[in-house]
Amino acid sequence: MTIERLDHVSVVVDDLAAAIAFFTALGMALEGQAPVEGPWVDRVNGLESVQVDIVMMRTPDGHGRLELTKFRNPQLVEIEPATAPPNALGLRSVMFTVESVDDTVARLRANGAELVGEVAQYEDKYRLCYVRGPAGIIVALAEELS
């Protein structure tokens, strides 16, 4: 038996509207949103009385999806440091291929993003950077060079 596909990546955020604006500015489309709760959600999460609002964002090619989750109950648990560096254990980043790193960074900065380091070129293949997005997550951007 083998996996069929990567369905989505989930990011817990504290400001759903800001996260939607950020990923829309990146170029993703809102696929849907809904409140989610019930015994099955409690069992999946291993928590009691879970109430969340979820939003699904889709990449332009339709192959990638990002779930933005805002917990109403139980309260969010903040990790330290909230702006963990790229070498922190756990999920490091989510990377998107973009047409122009510079244009994308400018759009994302207008939505609160900050560069983690700087834009750098890898050989004659890519221009790359990390930006810090909603809830402190690191979003990697890659521009393929011809």
Locations of the language-model features?
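Core segments of cupin and vicinal oxygen chelate
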Residues: V12-H63, A110, C129
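Exposed loop/turn and edge beta-strand positions of beta-sandwich/beta-sheet ligand-binding modules
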Residues: R5, V50-Q51, G90, K125
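Short glycine-rich, polar/acidic loop-and-turn segments at beta strand-coil junctions
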Residues: D61, K70-R72
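A short, acidic/glycine-rich surface segment
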Residues: G38-R43, Q75-P81
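Glycine-rich, pocket-lining loop/helix-strand segments that form or immediately flank
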Residues: R72-V77, A88
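Vicinal oxygen chelate
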Residues: T2, Q33-P35, M56, R65-T69, ...
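N-terminal beta-strand motif that seeds the catalytic metal site of vicinal oxygen chelate
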Residues: M1-I20, L26-G32, G90-F96, E143-S146
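A generic "binding-loop/recognition-motif" signal
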Residues: D15-L16, N73, V101
